[in-house]
Swiss-Prot record:
The record marks K29, K252 as: Transition state stabilizer. Catalyzes the ATP-dependent phosphorylation of N-acetyl-L-glutamate. One of its GO terms (molecular function) is acetylglutamate kinase activity. It is found in: Cytoplasm. Transmembrane segments: none annotated. This is Acetylglutamate kinase. CDD domains: AAK_NAGK-C. Belongs to the acetylglutamate kinase family. ArgB subfamily. One of its GO terms (biological process) is arginine biosynthetic process via ornithine.
């Protein structure tokens, strides 16, 4: 009997959140170990489908770093990173597009369909969704040039959400691969955290949720108990300046700051290694990970 009462408590706890977010759009940046483990994949997909069935509009922007790295290794193409961003030459760009658009995107769509949902996969090149231009990275070294060329790495100029709004209206879960175009035939690899943030802004999303391989933002990266459960954008900026936030967490934090400044209600950086972390973050009082607010 107790286990049934426990299930009832879970449903009752979720009810006010279901009411609160009914009809709202939530953008999910899907990446990290949750894309590698079959068990976690299944949990994420089921979370997305459940969200849709209770009236929330999830929009997925996915990464694919581990898959890209594996394919590049197979082809003996070296990977280099600057400030957490992959340097992308022409050969790397071909692999990035093949993996993100041709493999990862289609797999996610197939899993959503298998779980009973409806999904459409697209990249930023489709229907003029993401316009981009070349991105330069600030040189992390004190000597040499101030900015470094990252190759075919893009910075977003504009997001046209029309195709996403149409898909949402028709009951589909849009699944977006982070590749964009400059409108003149050149394509760019774009950091998925940046794409998720810009899509969230364009859709006026209530939340942006970022799945990571850490519990959230840590004050000491060697201590998972040093989790910062809530933070303002001013506090996050200070942590970046102090070097507490670094590496791959920098683009996540900077994208979160940008999204909140331009109207996204809150950004949640959560532990994608926990099964059903999406549901725990949205539908429970405690939540998981770090919540960033204005």
């Amino acid at each position: 009997m107790e286990k049934y009462l426990e299930k009832t408590k879970v449903l009752i706890e979720a009810l006010p959140y279901i009411k609160k977010f009914y009809g709202k759009t939530i953008v999910i940046k899907y990446g990290g170990h949750a894309m590698v483990s079959d068990q976690l994949k299944e949990a994420v997909i089921n979370d997305l489908v459940l969200m849709k069935f209770v009236g929330i509009n999830p929009v997925v922007v996915h990464g694919g770093g581990p898959e890209i790295s594996r394919m590049l290794n197979k082809l003996n193409i070296k990977s280099n990173f600057i400030n957490g961003l992959r340097v992308t030459d022409e050969a790397t760009l071909e692999v990035v597009e093949m993996v993100l658009v041709g493999k990862v995107n289609k797999e996610i769509v197939g899993l959503i369909e298998k779980a009973g949902g409806k999904a459409v996969g697209l990249s930023g090149k489709d229907a003029g969704l993401i316009k981009a231009h070349k991105k330069l990275a600030k040189n992390p070294e004190p000597t040499g040039e101030e900015y470094l060329d990252l190759g075919y790495v893009g910075e977003i100029s504009e997001v046209n959400p029309e195709i996403l709004l149409t898909l949402i209206d028709k009951g589909y879960i849009p699944v977006v691969a982070p590749v964009g175009s400059n409108g003149s035939g050149e394509f760019y690899n774009i950091n998925a955290d940046e794409v998720a943030a810009e899509v969230a802004v364009a859709l006026k999303a209530d939340k942006l949720i970022v799945l990571t391989d850490t519990p959230g933002i840590l004050l000491n990266e060697k201590d998972e108990n040093s989790l910062l459960s809530k933070a303002t954008i001013a506090e996050v900026k200070e942590l970046i300046n102090r070097g507490v936030i670094r590496g791959g967490m920098i683009p996540k934090a900077e994208s979160a700051i940008s999204a909140i400044k331009r109207g996204v209600g809150s950004v949640h950086i959560i532990d994608g290694r926990i099964a059903h972390s999406l549901l725990l973050e949205i539908f429970t009082d405690a939540g998981v990970g770090t919540m960033l607010t204005p």
